[in-house]
């Protein structure tokens, strides 16, 4: 019966049936909205989520459909961030505000064009987010959305599956997370001459593109909430065997403020007015750990099996040289393609597959062709 309902519902609104995938149920969020009259709805992703796009459209849909419900909406979108950063900032930006009833997430585009993640990295990030949600807020109903950029759209048009989408899909299938394949729907509608890339608005959609996305979500939720009202909330499945043993399920930030400073390092606001490159407002007026002196080491200990840093990498970004436990050596060039004219936020990982336990790390700045500046907003621990 459900299959028939899905087909007729999707045919009615003209969407390709495989592009709106309902997995599991949305009974828990419905109970919070209809029975309790109070619900928390969080949106996580990059600039597509942060901007006034599909997110406020869905907020408006929920508020109008349920005027008696007191909604708390969380905008956890941060431009340029990928699923790796998402896994480490989830406790701060979302879970710190208490249980979440409905959670929307998108990282397909940024895992592709910003982070250029491998399949393993895409899985570590997305699975880490889903497992954290399932462990700390087990009744949360989740929807993932695949937005699209020109390269990914061309891949779909040629019958290929973009790497970030196929990687995320493995996670969504395993944890029975519902999915909106906006990218594939757009490709299909363009082929039918119902839409154009220009009308959609590009990687950061214009109102028509965001309306298409919001409509798909509204239809999914309307379908999920169409039966008799449930009375008992149930936790979602939480498999004990993850896809990746190195996923960031225990991802969290460690403030550099807790690190003992050594010569050459400061925990303060950089001298932004005298630094070349664009600066985003959210990162100003806040202290961070920084140095522009090469070969000045700083040391600290951490508990976990992964260590990295959430940094601002500008035109003068250098290279971090590191040593873990006195035996694992490496270096990471902080400079990114987007760093040429912007102090660009990105997460770099030093190690993700250590043995669980206490470790020590030493880091220092090594000059690169662009400069030798290191600016760390948070350390990333898993």
Q: Model-derived features: where do they sit?
A:
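Bacterial N-terminal signal peptides
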Residues: 1-11
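Membrane/wall-proximal cationic-aromatic binding patches
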Residues: 15-43, 48, 62
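Catalytic nucleophile-elbow at a beta strand-turn-alpha helix junction centered on a G-D-S/GDSL motif
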Residues: 38-53, 78-82, 306, 315
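Alpha-helical cap/lid subdomain in secreted, periplasmic
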Residues: 56-72, 81, 85-234, 254, ...
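Surface-exposed aromatic
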Residues: 75
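Surface beta-strand/loop "capping" patches
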Residues: 231-304
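C-terminal interaction-tip segments
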Residues: 381-382
